[in-house]
């Protein structure tokens, strides 16, 4: 069973420009979540949904349509496997394993053109609403 650990160092600038650092550790089993997703009728699953952070997995089969709408929060995609393109605000970017993409809030975007199964982790800078 493969576990991915995401360690995020968060830096806060408080009043008076004092710096505070803390470590946020999230443990999740992406294989388990992807296997559940493959058996469902959906192509994405949010497994952590907090007020300030949402994390989930996206899985698209070759040719499957990505119908997502712009989100109210900034989003980061980490490509786990596959290929294709990510269309962000009228520009397309080729995607491949281990690449990271940032999409600002309220910006139209979608994946397309994958000839292999495409799986990605996504992180919202807020809840997945």
Describe the role of every protein-language-model region.
Residues 1-53, 67:
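A short, N-terminal "cap"/entry segment at the start of jelly-roll beta-barrel domains
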Residues 51-53, 58, 83, 91:
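Well-ordered beta-strand scaffold positions
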Residues 56-71:
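Conserved short histidine dyad/triad with adjacent acidic residue
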Residues 58, 77, 101:
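Conserved GNAT-family N-acetyltransferase fold
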Residues 67, 76, 90-93:
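Short, surface-exposed secondary-structure edge patches
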Residues 71-85:
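Short, conserved beta-strand element in jelly-roll/cupin
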Residues 91-105:
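Short acidic-glycine-tyrosine-enriched beta hairpin
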Residues 105-129:
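Ligand-binding loop in jelly-roll beta-barrel domains
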């Amino acid at each position: 069973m493969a576990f991915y650990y995401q360690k995020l160092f968060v830096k806060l600038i408080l009043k008076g420009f004092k710096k505070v650092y803390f470590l946020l550790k999230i443990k999740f089993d992406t294989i388990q979540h992807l296997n559940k997703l493959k058996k469902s009728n959906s192509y994405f699953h949010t497994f952590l949904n907090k007020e300030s952070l949402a994390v989930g997995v996206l899985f698209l089969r070759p040719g499957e349509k990505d119908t997502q709408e712009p989100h109210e929060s900034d989003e980061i995609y980490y490509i786990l496997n596959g290929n294709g393109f990510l269309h962000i605000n009228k520009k397309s970017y080729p995607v491949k394993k281990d690449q990271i993409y940032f999409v600002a809030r309220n910006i139209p975007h979608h994946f397309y053109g994958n000839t292999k199964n495409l799986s990605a982790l996504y992180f919202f800078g807020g809840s997945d609403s």
